């Protein structure tokens, strides 16, 4: 039990440190935030100045039919990049939400970069 609490506290400290460094997203450069559950992967692009979600995507969408593995997360990044291009958004602030930058998070960010989104 103690190890779980310590891990949670470390994640919260990482999350706060990241938020302090990246700041807030604006209309010209919105913030993309990530959330992982045990089963699904979610990403949403947020304009913090208006408090609105500009674009969101997840593996739970029926039309995508994706699971939570690295290959499908790369496809998710590709689809999100296309949706962002439709809305003329090319620059983002990447908020990894306290998660370590490896595995799914890293492959998602790399996929966005490969399809022309500046992070």
From Swiss-Prot:
InterPro entries in the record: Ribosomal_uL18_bac-type, Ribosomal_uL18_bac/euk
Presence of keyword Repeat: no
Keyword Ribonucleoprotein set for record: yes
Pfam families assigned to the protein according to its UniProt record, in alphabetical order: Ribosomal_L18p (PF00861)
Entry's Gene Ontology BP terms: translation
CC annotations in GO: cytoplasm; ribonucleoprotein complex; ribosome
CDD domains: Ribosomal_L18_L5e (cd00432)
Region: Disordered, residue numbers: 1-20
Any GO molecular function: 5S rRNA binding
Compositional bias ranges of the Basic and acidic residues kind: 1-10
Top-level lineage group: Bacteria
Keywords: Ribonucleoprotein, Ribosomal protein, RNA-binding, rRNA-binding
Cross-referenced SUPFAM superfamilies: Translational machinery components
Binding partners and assembly: Part of the 50S ribosomal subunit; part of the 5S rRNA/L5/L18/L25 subcomplex. Contacts the 5S and 23S rRNAs.
HAMAP family named in the record: Ribosomal_uL18_B (MF_01337_B)
Protein family membership: Belongs to the universal ribosomal protein uL18 family.
Function: This is one of the proteins that bind and probably mediate the attachment of the 5S RNA into the large ribosomal subunit, where it forms part of the central protuberance.
Protein name: Large ribosomal subunit protein uL18
Organism annotation: Borrelia garinii subsp. bavariensis (strain ATCC BAA-2496 / DSM 23469 / PBi) (Borreliella bavariensis)
Gene that specifies this protein: rplR
